[in-house]
Structures are given as structure tokens and as C-alpha cells.
Amino acid sequence: KLLGDIIEQKGAGEGFGVAFIDSKEIWYLETGSGHQWLAVRLPADSYFVSANQGRLRHYDPNDNANYMASPTLVSFAKKQGLYDPARGEFDFHQAYSQDNKNDTTYNYPRVWTLQHQFNPHLDTVVSEGETFPVFLTPITKISVAAVKNALRNHYQGTSHDPYASHNPQEPWRPISVFRTQESHILQVRPKLPQAIGNVEYIAYGMPSLSVYLPYYQGMRHYQPGDDKGTDRASNDSTYWTFRTLQTLVMQDYNAFAPDVQHAWKTFEQQTAKQQYKMEQSYLRLYASHPKEAQRLLQNFEDKTMQNAQTLARRLTNNIITTMTYRTDMKYHFSSTQP
């Protein structure tokens, strides 16, 4: 409601979407640009996928438990010729968003791919984005690991993978792109103390070549390099530690990516096991020994972040070693040359 009030008062120059999550529910807000907006509460058993396009459709002004909107959302659309009641019920997407040729390659494939990942038997066609369901119930519960995989998707295993095929002109825009600055996953577990129940997983840079690191709400300090990072590479920046590695991998994706991805997969699996052990120990301590529980959590954070950066530097050095050897072989000028 606060963001909606700002949109109504100040306006928005373009469409955007924002998710809100707490211990009870998730809401998703989209703007219609200008001073119009719509927010919908996600059904408890459903998930929502969005690319760079408005996706919300249905609006029930009488259902305050599941919908919030700008007061003139429907009347403005009618006045401006964006909605004709004679043609059926109000559709937010049809009134305030669009489906054009660019969407068929830039947006539709991403939504279609993830919906089919969580609902493999879905019969939608990738080129018909206007038919995609807004909300879907997955065939199995979606885990944090599944969300990581989703955000790393680049159509691997298909002809649309731009990295494996060395094709920067691939029409389908992948989910994982090099220009990603950070990728975030928010997890709220209401049955746990907030200190460990609320976790933000952050991957610095390109998700498919990065590692998702767990930042617990209860941590008290970060690593020294976490607050450093500009558009200039630097050795003391956490961001650039991972970004440098990704830049090197992209010089020969097929040669370097498999080892890096395997290393991060192993690291995340090991970290997940360590998280579980830490959380169990925290639960045994936090009521009677809160300071000890806090130290336990902080020590886990410090060790995890330090180990991730150490691994990133080792992987970087491995690639530099290989590239140095290649360069030497290419420009060796051996004395035995004819």
C-alpha cells in the first residue's frame, strides 16, 4: 500500500514489478505506468514467474483480502479507451501492458521455460505468451535449490543456449545473463526464529557461473569486501572476486564453465549440509544461551563467505594458468622452428 500511494502521488515512468514477502503471505505489485498499479496476493499453493513484461490480469475490487489497486485503475482505463466493458471483464494486462514481437523472444521463452520446469505437462506454446497462466501449482514443492537452478537457466541442452553455441545473437534472451549484477532469493520460514528463519541468498554476477551465498538475518557483520564495488575492477571487492572469474570463463565457455559450475554445485551442497547442522545447534542454544547462538551463526557466515572467495580465487588462478599455457604455445617461437 505504501508503494502504491507513492505511485499514485508521484507516478511511474515505466512499468515494473515488486514482490513483498513476510511471515504470512506474498504479494506482487505491478504498475501500469503513470499513476496506476495493481497488487495481488499469491495463492499459498502457487508460484509466479515474470520476465520483463506485465503479467497480472484479473482484478476483483470487492476482494480486499487478495487485491489492492489504485482507485482509478478501471475508470481510467475506460476513459482512455484501454478497456471496454462490453468486451468482458477488466483485464489489467490487456489494458496496461502489451504483447508485441519483441516479447516473443525476450520475455515469453523465459516464462514458458520455468513454467514447464515446474509443470512439465503444461501444454502451452512458447510463442503464445498471452495464453500463459498467471499462477500455477507446481507438481512438487519448490525448494531453494530448484529456484537456484531456475535462475541459472540459459536454455542449456537446447539449440537456444547462447553460451555453449558461442552465439551472442541468439534471439531468445536467457534467464542467466552476463550483465546480471546480483541475483537474490528470499526465504522466510515462520516456524524458526527470525535470525535463522529469514535468509537471503545472493549470487554476485552471472547466476550460472556464480554461487548463491546464504546471508542470515541474524548476522551482525559482513566481510570486509562486501561493501566495495564500482564499475572498476578491484582486488578488495567481494563482487569483483566473483566477477573476474566469470569474465575469464566467458572467454571460452565450453572449456571453463563445466569445472566452475561443478565446483559451485559441490560448494552449495556442502554449505546446505553445514547450514542444517548450524541451524540445529542454534535452536538448541538460542533460548538459554543467546550470545553463544549468535557467535555460532556469525562464525558460520564468516567461514562460508571466506571459503567461497578462496574457492573463487583458486578457480580464477586455474583458468589463468590454462590461458597462460595456451598463449605461450600460440606465441612460443621455438628455436626448432624451420
Give the label of every model feature segment:
Residues 11, 15, 23-25, 49-338:
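C-terminus-biased signal that marks the final domain/tail of proteins
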